[in-house]
């Protein structure tokens, strides 16, 4: 149980030899001198050593040795401790030799179940010296189906265990209450405070060791006191640890041991009469044991104490509650059935403080300061839990309470919650009559959802048995079940009652040869999609405590082998598909009505193929006419296409504007794949006939069918990666565009991408600065890296470059390339409402590799954060403008090492905020070498006195060929490399001639 109040006792291991010495093991007439932690202690004759006490457990021996260690030289205290140990050993002997009564056979468990965790240290037999303990576990009433032994503080030699085994268990079993032992998760793993699992020599982490540990756990915690099962508490406070650190290997081992326990007891165990239970605070996706452990458990108990347990936690980003009760169940429903699922609340623990105050039961009334009792459940969270049922799957198994020995005690009032020293009347110990538990059990017993399914629900016995086997035994299961129901017993003669299903996901009717008619009188209520009418009884974050009703999808219907079926009526269900109808096996069909749906029956569709098969069967039996076959008044639903046919658009340069959406994004498709691009297409579709009759409703107009693209957005990117969201494109300049369309539902993933070419096509540039390495500069290095992450980021991202108005970044590009353009964005590009000052001046520079050593730069780049080491290739000045971005052309630069300087011209708090910097061009291996080849060619062409005019003309032609390919609209690396190679060869020949 997730209880902050409980502090688990950790016992240190103290070596017996250093504590007591060998002298304590002997019995001399005179006083013995004993060494305990290097201190001399005198002990009277006749007192035994701790290790000589044969019945005490090793854990209890450790405790007594620790007490002796602390006692030091206080002879009287040592004597008292040893006497206490001797008495403990006698009690342990009594426990070891007690006779366990014969087990009383128990009836099968049926919901609605009520469980309660009884704290052993509050049983009056736990420690007779504590006179304030007035409750006994054996007094739990018959309304408690599951009594959990929540053990802490009670010694393993306490006579409570004898009382439990010889009196409590037989008495509780006789009234129908099962008694379950709870152990922490870590007991299955070894490591810190892991009980018998600490003995790694006896229980090593091996397959055989895990089997042995599982058996020892069941023997110790179930069979030893003749209990009815085992409960493993899976939560963060009980996670396996080694040296106080969470142990991943221990978690994995605990799963294996859990499985081994499940092979001994529980639904898959050798002994199925003993229950195997898991309780947890985790959501399913955070519970490491649930996936592999679920098949082995009878029940799952989930602790949902307090307001957040009921309502979930509010998530401000998504603006909705998370970890709600329904979400918690949905997660676990993948692994267990609803009748296995129980939810829990907590009674008020005495002296509980902030962090352990749940307010699940009623508080003490202000005027009732002397009385700490309040047994009224009206309006409590506990009562709401008793009434709550999952919206899907079926009815829950029941509820449980923690600290049931506090049943009836009022909760401490909220106004005292933070007064740590305050002691309220509710902190007193009271004898309980379990009025609250009884009342909560009564609430569940009155819940009609738990009524058993009977012949009134399903008159056909074979059908009833099939439903109860697959769905559940309770009436409330019928309206909640959202799985698959397969009916394949040929003995089924009637399907009456299936209309009680409201959320069925799939209905399989297979080989039911005695069924002659299928229509809405027997088919599930959700043959037609609808809204969930089940309302929550829980408190929610909504002001009116009402949730928006969820949509219930239509049931998927599979019909095959109904050879006796004569009449099939699926009219008026708003269904879009006939898939699932094995029409060829419906060999006796005489009448079919599929009118009033949303079916596309166009030629070539799956719907049409199925319908034609049924039509043929009916024609062969009774003939096809308007009385035997109805298929009219269809209103097919229009859907957005998955893909769009038009992926490119070529336009001439002209002084015009083009609507991109109307040119590139259009069309509506049925779920059968029939594409309709225009109203003319729709009219032709609407006029299509089957046997002289139209299937599309004549009053179903195109505007009702077509989908709307009105709220779709567009992102238009030009060849320099400049973007706009304007759906209208001007064609007044030669350019190539990438056009992305986005749906209102998802603004991040394009539903369609197309290329638009105005004039001659251009190759799209690449941002060569994306992923660049920041190697120096004055800017904050963490935020400087964000400048090159390829995205503007969100409005809340911190991308300030530092505590000064002027900041620099030195960076290296990832790959060689030919740089033709650059762009940077002001903060207003990502946040129009920003108060950050825009960049007023900027300079873009490349490293002066001609005059300075690159290796020195790389060894200590911050020393090179000076203008003299850099060559400025472009500058920017705002001149009073507040632009969101600046971009400009560059002239075929090939440097990989760059420096950029941004200046807001403000005070030291007006730091530059630059979401993104782009260095634009084309990847080109050996770009620097290629450009040097061009430079060399230009230099040689000036040496007219050394070469003939013919040679100079040839050199010029090859130089121009390379420059043309470098500046071509279509950037062709192959052509560039070929021209560079030719020019290089030409240069080398001229240089040889020169020599």
Curated annotation (Swiss-Prot):
Catalytic residues in the record: 235 (proton donor)
Subcellular location: Secreted; Host extracellular space
Catalytic activity: an N(4)-(oligosaccharide-(1->3)-[oligosaccharide-(1->6)]-beta-D-Man-(1->4)-beta-D-GlcNAc-(1->4)-alpha-D-GlcNAc)-L-asparaginyl-[protein] + H2O = an oligosaccharide-(1->3)-[oligosaccharide-(1->6)]-beta-D-Man-(1->4)-D-GlcNAc + N(4)-(N-acetyl-beta-D-glucosaminyl)-L-asparaginyl-[protein]
Signal peptide region: 1-36
PTM notes: Cleaved by SpeB protease; leading to loss of endoglucosidase activity. EndoS is produced and secreted prior to SpeB, suggesting that it is degraded after acting as a host immune evasion factor.
Domain named GH18: residues: 112-432
Known uses: The role played by EndoS in the specific inhibition of host immunoglobulin-gamma (IgG)-mediated immune response makes it a promising candidate for the treatment of some autoimmune disease.
Gene Ontology CC: extracellular region; host extracellular space
GO function terms (MF aspect): calcium ion binding; mannosyl-glycoprotein endo-beta-N-acetylglucosaminidase activity; toxin activity
GO biological process, one term: carbohydrate metabolic process
Keyword Hydrolase annotated: yes
Residue numbers spanned by region carbohydrate-binding module (CBM): 765-923
LRR repeats: 437-460, 478-503, 562-585, 586-609
Primary residence: secreted
EC number(s) on file: 3.2.1.96
Keyword vocabulary terms for this entry: Calcium, Glycosidase, Hydrolase, Leucine-rich repeat, Metal-binding, Repeat, Secreted, Signal, Virulence
Feature type site, description Cleavage: 445-446
Residues where Ca(2+) binds: 786, 789, 791, 915-916
Mutant lacking the gene: phenotype: Decreased virulence in a mouse model of invasive infection.
Effect noted on mutating residue 233 to C: Retains some endoglucosidase activity, has a strong ability to mediate transglycosylation
Annotated positions binding a glycoprotein: 151, 153, 186, 237, 303, 305, 349-350, 356, 402
Alphabetized InterPro entries for the sequence: EndoS-like_Ig-like, EndoS_F2-like_TIM-barrel, EndoS_helical, Glyco_hydro_18_chit_AS, Glycoside_hydrolase_SF, LRR_dom_sf
Class of this enzyme: hydrolase
Family membership noted in the UniProt record: Belongs to the glycosyl hydrolase 18 family.
Role: Endoglucosidase that acts as a host immune evasion factor by mediating hydrolysis of the N-linked glycan from the Fc region of host immunoglobulin-gamma (IgG) during infection. Specifically catalyzes the hydrolysis of the beta-1,4 linkage between the first two N-acetylglucosamine residues of the complex-type N-linked glycan located on 'Asn-297' of the Fc region of IgG antibodies (IGHG1, IGHG2, IGHG3 or IGHG4), thereby preventing interaction between IgGs and Fc receptors and ability to activate the complement pathway.
Name of this protein: Endo-beta-N-acetylglucosaminidase EndoS
Species of provenance: Streptococcus pyogenes serotype M1
